[in-house]
Curated annotation (Swiss-Prot):
The keyword tRNA processing applies. ATP binds at G8, P9, T10, A11, V12, G13, K14, T15. It catalyses: adenosine(37) in tRNA + dimethylallyl diphosphate = N(6)-dimethylallyladenosine(37) in tRNA + diphosphate. This is tRNA dimethylallyltransferase. It is an enzyme of class 2 (transferase). Catalyzes the transfer of a dimethylallyl group onto the adenine at position 37 in tRNAs that read codons beginning with uridine, leading to the formation of N6-(dimethylallyl)adenosine (i(6)A). One of its GO terms (biological process) is tRNA modification. The record marks T99, R121 as: Interaction with substrate tRNA. The keyword ATP-binding applies. Belongs to the IPP transferase family.
Amino acid sequence: MKIAIVGGPTAVGKTDIMIEVCEEIGAEIISMDSRQIYRYMDIGTAKPTPEQRKRVPHHMIDILDPDEYYNAFLYRKDSLKAVEAILKRGKIPVYVGGTGLYADALVRGIFEGVPADENIRKELRELERREPGILRKMLEEFDPEAATRIHPNDLKRTIRALEVYMKTGRRISELQKETKGDDRFFIIVLTRERYDLYDRINRRVDRMIEMGLVDEVKRLLSMGYSKDLNSMKTIGYKEVIEYLEGKYDFEKMVHLIKRNTRHFARRQIIWFKRYENAIWYNLTFVSKEELKKTLKELIVKNFSV
């Protein structure tokens, strides 16, 4: 039995096509999106609509409040429980989403062997406060491979990698390779030509604004959720907050959301290219009906192995 992970960049069209595919093969969708797990954050995370969720059952959506902690280790554990429940119902589980870290957790396993050390973390945070950018330089020196995988702005993962090195004297990239992978999964990646994808991103952002993204952010702030929460730093929410603070005007806000989303999509594509055995489909050149037929056959065939 092989379970499909259908990944790809934001706005490529994963949700729409996979709802139709899963509806026709009797499958249930497990969201692989690190932002759709949060309640009240609907428009800016492009959650499936209530109508879509009625057509095909979805899992790992709306499971946490925006101020609750979550990570890839917990995602793997919780989503595999969903897999078990789906299998007991005689249905096919299919992962759909663009969070590469969650895909890694499933396919390559999670390295959790070194306990957290708050003293080291505090020391590293203080070092970064005194000299911004120093932790990135340290990571590039001590673990160049990890530095290529961790975004320069991802302070949390940078600190974790340095913490592991300081505690063990070993690189986290080496320890992660020793983590046992999981061969129950195979990866399908949906992509588009850049001009096509960027146009879809721009139009999606316009729709989010029309649907009330600004009001959604205002409501979250009025509920007491801090702008400093990890969830509130999501693209779309962060820019709206800064607009509400008067840092720039409405047009600049929209421009920044579009630009930052395009950059994010590019990083997602780079991430999924790391999976050597992934099966890629370019939606710019393949018809929807042809792709649906191919995906249905591929998912069912591998599930039946």
